[in-house]
Amino acid sequence: FGHPAKDMTLSEAAMIAGIIPAPSAWDPAISPDKAKERWERVLGLMVEDGWVSQADADAAVFPETIDPDSLNRESMQGTNGYLIAHIKQELVNSGAFFEDQITQGGLRITTTIVKERQDEAVAAAQTMNSVNGWDPAHQHVALSSIDPNTGEILAEYGGPDYEQRQQNAVTQDIAMAGSAFKPFALLANARQGGTVNDTYSGASPQTFPGLVEPVTNDGGYSFGNVTLVKATAYSMNTPYVALNRDIGPETTMQAAVDAGIPQETLGLNDQLLNVLGSASPHNIDLATAYATIANGGQRVEPHIVRQVTNSGGSNKLYETTVAPTRVFEAEEVSSIMPALEAVTTGEGTADSVAGALRGFTTAGKTGTSSDQLSAQFVGFVPNMVTAVSMYQSDDDGNSVPLENIGGLDQFHGGDWPVDVWTNYMQNATKSLTEKDFTWIVKSNRNSKNNAPSSVPAPTQEPTQEASNPEPTYEPTRAPEPEPTQTATPGNGGGNGGGGNGGGNGGGGNGGGNGGGGNGGGNGGGGNGGGNGGGGGGGGGANPGAAGGN
């Protein structure tokens, strides 16, 4: 509006309030009719609640806004705009600078971004533009790549053009973790002396105390007794819910928080089905948590700024301090690695990864929304962790399923997200010299058989497996209730059932049985946004279901 917030009129304030749930979708510069519709709604509600009189509301005139194209924003165009906005927000959040100090010049800012890695990330993410059925205006890719030893963000793809969408897919959008949450149960189990060679029943369905509906594996496939290595590779649900019952879901939640999932993450809870990924973290949060594993149990904070000096470089004004915090013992993390490595080899849900990065020890986990609102893969090699998330939104920013993409019947974390991850990592890892994790130590744990003495005979096994049972309490989708709308055009979709070991639903290598849900939250914005983000891509509701591959 061209003036300070304290000088806003009733009309201006009503317009701002109206577009908060989805500012990119309802921006008056992009959708003036929608912005005016929202403005009228706010004024009507203010009259109903007694905040303004009917006469004042009738006299209000829809406000004029400054044409964003008239502003000097060339530097914010394209993919670099997301980096610049992230840098500004990180420095403001540090408390060392005001925004005016950053924008008015006179500072030399050194970032952690490696140009070659950034170019490779952009190229890899934008390979989706050539996929039949992919529409970058509504379908979104988030990619973050970090050094697990320092937390330095090496590359970040937050979207194709910041001027078109001021919502960073990496730091602001959210998506249910789905089966990408399962490694935290492995860590919690390791803390209690468990091992990935512990055995559980893979039978499906299975009933559990406190749940009205039985838990099932993807497509209804039933297995015999399986180790947690196989349960992870195939992303089975029933063994993981049984494991979570034994160790206590509160310990799984705590392991996730210790690894790097923020305590305030939407959907994070201590319920039995949290192991299936009811939490909806940002892409960068998952990358951070997996970096803790890749760093042998030491957590570091992700950051994009290395240091700030005056324009001449002679006076250092700010420097990011790297202070690793040990949250898991190296032996505990070492003990779960066989399960995460199995995901990227053999019949794992990301089995193409190891072959594409020959010579490297690879590990990770896929995740898919049960109704295909999102899909992702978080994988790592020594000294590099990369998370890839994909999701879709409609014109109003609501999450909608990823359908009819590339000729596939279903969209899974083990499909395009793994392809983009591999495309990026094949080039990005050329500069890495370490092929194996140097912190790995021998684990002498005794395995336990936790399976019942009698289980149903296994049905024929699919080539890949995941899963996604639904909780009895969910108003949103597979495992966890979601808010009805998000703050900004966010990545609503979650990771639930489906594909490559996906969710609870039939079809293909996965599928998904999750119910729909309304995601979102009020927040978003800035570095890491807030508890906002919201539904698929362009801004709205419905982050996806959990529990999938």
Regions flagged by a language model, labelled:
Residues 212-216, 248-288:
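Mid-domain, small-residue-enriched loop/turn segments at the edges of structured enzyme/sensor domains
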